[in-house]
Amino acid sequence: MTEELQSLVDSIEAEAQRDRPAADTPEIGIVMGSDSDLDVMAGSEEGRPGAYDALTELGFAEQTSYENPPEARFTFETYVVSAHRTPGLMYTYAETAADRGLDVVIAGAGGKSADLPNMTASIAYPLPVIGVPVQEKSVDSVIGMP
């Protein structure tokens, strides 16, 4: 694991140990396996809304720092975590999600097997994980999620 990746894992684990008020933590986590999934998860230039667009339309704000949360009452965070390329980060993200204040995770499924939403759901249980097909070939796997 690279130093940068280990630093991110350590930061997520440390945040899970802090006892922050609910108003200072995001309610929703958005994860995707690759930055190439960002167009679908955030919203595309062609005007198709993504999870980011939907949440901001509902009044949520993106929270990029626990130390300086946005003024909005409802917030979300966005991470790129791969079940294949960064499994340690994905595991830490899912395992600490509830302790970091998340109420739900929205996970983009980029491949046929929907590994990211399925693995995130199995680790973060009982926290709900909503799988979003990023590609057409992901639809069947996401529909088949428990």
Residue locations for each model-derived region?
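Short, ordered loop/turn segments at secondary-structure junctions
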Residues: 35, 81-83, 110-111, 133-137
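Short coil/turn connectors at secondary-structure junctions
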Residues: 24-27, 72-74, 100-103, 124-129
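Short glycine/serine/threonine-rich phosphate/pyrophosphate-binding segments
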Residues: 37-41, 87-89, 112-119, 138-142
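Glycine-rich phosphate/diphosphate-binding loop of Rossmann-like nucleotide-binding domains
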Residues: 18-85
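N-terminal small/polar loop signature for handling phosphorylated ligands or for N-terminal nucleophile
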Residues: 84-105, 119-120
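Haloarchaeal acidic low-complexity proteome signature biased toward cell-envelope/secretome components but also
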Residues: 1-25
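Short, acidic/small-residue loops that bind anionic groups at enzyme active sites
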Residues: 120-146
